[in-house]
Amino acid sequence: SGNFVQRGEPAIVEKFARAETALVQGVDLVLELPVVYSIQDAGGFATGSIWTLDHVGVTDVVFGSETDDIDLMKAVSEVLIKEPEHYHDLLKKHLKTGHSFPNARKYALRDFIHTENSTFSHRIEEIGSSNNILGVEYLRAIQEIKSKMIPHSMRRVGASYTDEEHRGEFSSATAIRRLIQNGNIESASQAIPKESFDIILREIRSGRGPVFKEDVESFFISFYRLLSRDDYNRYYGFVEGLDARFQECSLSGSLEEFLHCVKSKRFTLSRIRRLMYYPVFRFTDNLIRKSNEFGPQYIRVLGFNEKGRNHLSNIKHSMKIPIITTASLWRKVVDGALKKEMEIDVDLLEAQLERDFAAVRFYASLFRYPESRSKCSDLLSRVIYDEEDS
């Protein structure tokens, strides 16, 4: 993800700094998932991710989950792809009881597997966690785009993703963010490799971080008070009365109050957190539908070492979409792609890329110091090159 992540929050530090933390730990190549995918639900996030990896010739994809049973995940993904009539009926039944779509789907899958697949019926409850759901969506996306990529599941150890307790070197991402937010830098450093933590510390000292969901509170409260119901209807996801709920709750005194005002049995907090950004970044139905159908229209490189750079050099002549390493030259890159008759939709490319640029501008407005917020643009950023690992 770039500067805004799938849980519907700003990242703790900006995308190039996070790319640098990965490179110093031995990663060869860091690519950005466009923001039109990074703050979608698990299905949209996985679709954009798999398209991106497939375009650059990745042969194997590894993801963390609470189960390492890839066969169980494949069985569930097959149901989601084929949508058998029995499963579809179960899904409608659970939706009619008022469950949110993620929960209705989870219960429908549980009921379907219990009756149709005795091999996995005793383990279907494992699929309910967010990481397992995302893993299933990766498998679904691999099949839907007909990728030859081989999936591998790596079992998570230590704290669960949302565990807020500090547990030393195996603390969750949630716990680490909470420690940093509370100023407990020393404890946070125990859970992050020193080279990576030094980069995070550099960003904090410069005023370019840490950024938390609370930092967008005043903006969102003001922004949503200015919108009418017609405004909401221009954007993706505002269905089943959500436009009315957002408008009614816009008079809330805090972001937390707003979220719980909008929340219902059908609309989960995670969905609402993501949805909050859609009017800000102008996520229309057409943009999201086309993005999910045709995939990212470019590859955005955030960082590489010599090995990663060589890989890009080796594949550039067989690429179906352009590779953007210097954002300020994106028009030149697109012109070159058109001359090579690459398979791109220029209007969709511009729409996706402009949202990435907007995300950087918005994120920079959350920095602590005015000098850090000033003149911060994706067009001024340079790809990170890790020479030490070359």
List each model region and its residues:
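Functionally constrained cores in energy, signaling, and assembly domains
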Residues: 3, 19-21, 60, 345
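A glycine-rich helix N-cap at a beta->alpha junction
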Residues: 20, 24-34
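Short, charge-rich amphipathic segments
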Residues: 16-18, 22, 68, 176
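Active-site cores that bind ATP or allylic diphosphates and position pyrophosphate for catalysis
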Residues: 33-390
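N-terminal catalytic cores of NTP/NDP-binding nucleotidyl/phosphoryl-transfer enzymes
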Residues: 1-18
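Generic alpha-helical scaffold signal
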Residues: 12-16, 24, 39-47
